[in-house]
């Protein structure tokens, strides 16, 4: 018989039969057509690793950080809000600042945020953090999922602006967005080197296969 259990070291993240789950704050409401599970008097949303790189990273063993109910998260590249909605489930008394540059994606994101008071959608360019400096609190986690060649640079700049001294940064490095002609392994090594040379310590890193090809999740913290 299957049971819902909390993932070790991951507050607010649960697992049942190899499926990740988060508690649904709006019972009966789906965000992206995800499955719903009722267990022990609670409703859970299935966190699809093929729709969310963070779910893929956790299933592949990423550890070393945990969000609390009152955590502040800066999400760079929130898109339509799939992953951000699950983070919202976890940080129930916190805040998820969702940076998205595409007006089309922002329209979808706004629909998700309407029923989630802890999500703040911002139509901004993640490569220009000073433009939203006064709108975002200091963050416990800066999460980056953008398909740009300079993704590591903008990730570092946002951490320099917003990351708390004891906070964490998590980037989903997309090798093919940086250079389609070169080995992903070499690209990952170079991007990790950029993070280290900018004063960040690597806490963990995992590939996202089989859910995402040529992607790596890299978790960092200030090297102080």
Swiss-Prot record:
InterPro entries the UniProt entry points to: Fibrillarin, Fibrillarin_CS, SAM-dependent_MTases_sf
PROSITE patterns the record matches: FIBRILLARIN
Family stated for the protein in its record: Belongs to the methyltransferase superfamily. Fibrillarin family.
Biological process, per Gene Ontology: box C/D sno(s)RNA 3'-end processing; tRNA processing
SUPFAM superfamilies registered for this protein in UniProt: S-adenosyl-L-methionine-dependent methyltransferases
Keywords (A to Z) from UniProt: Methyltransferase, RNA-binding, rRNA processing, Transferase, tRNA processing
Enzyme type, top EC level: transferase
EC number: 2.1.1.-
HAMAP family named in the record: RNA_methyltransf_FlpA
Sample GO molecular function, one term: rRNA methyltransferase activity
Name of encoding gene: flpA
UniProt cross-references to Pfam families, sorted A to Z: Fibrillarin
Coiled-coil parts of chain: none
Protein name per UniProt: Fibrillarin-like rRNA/tRNA 2'-O-methyltransferase
Organism: Methanothermobacter thermautotrophicus (strain ATCC 29096 / DSM 1053 / JCM 10044 / NBRC 100330 / Delta H)
Top-level lineage group: Archaea
Protein function: Involved in pre-rRNA and tRNA processing. Utilizes the methyl donor S-adenosyl-L-methionine to catalyze the site-specific 2'-hydroxyl methylation of ribose moieties in rRNA and tRNA. Site specificity is provided by a guide RNA that base pairs with the substrate. Methylation occurs at a characteristic distance from the sequence involved in base pairing with the guide RNA.
């Amino acid at each position: 018989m299957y049971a819902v259990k909390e993932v070790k070291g991951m507050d607010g993240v649960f697992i049942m039969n190899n499926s990740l789950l988060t508690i649904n704050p709006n019972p009966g409401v789906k965000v992206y057509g995800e499955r719903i599970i009722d267990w022990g008097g609670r409703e859970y949303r299935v966190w699809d690793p093929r729709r969310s790189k963070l779910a893929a990273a956790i299933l592949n063993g990423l550890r070393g950080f945990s969000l609390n109910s009152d955590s502040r998260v800066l999400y760079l590249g929130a898109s339509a809000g799939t992953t951000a909605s699950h983070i919202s489930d976890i940080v129930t008394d916190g805040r998820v600042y969702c940076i998205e540059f595409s007006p089309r994606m922002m329209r979808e994101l706004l629909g998700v945020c309407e029923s989630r008071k802890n999500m703040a959608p911002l139509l901004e360019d993640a490569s220009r953090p000073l433009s939203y400096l006064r709108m975002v609190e200091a963050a416990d986690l800066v999460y980056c999922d953008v398909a740009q060649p300079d993704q590591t640079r903008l990730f570092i700049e946002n951490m320099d602006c917003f990351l708390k001294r004891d906070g964490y940064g998590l980037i989903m490095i997309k090798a093919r967005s940086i250079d389609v002609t070169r080995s992903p392994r070499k690209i990952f090594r170079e991007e990790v080197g950029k993070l280290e040379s900018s004063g960040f310590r690597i806490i963990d890193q995992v590939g996202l296969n089989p859910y995402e090809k040529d992607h790596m999740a890299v978790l960092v913290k200030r090297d102080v």
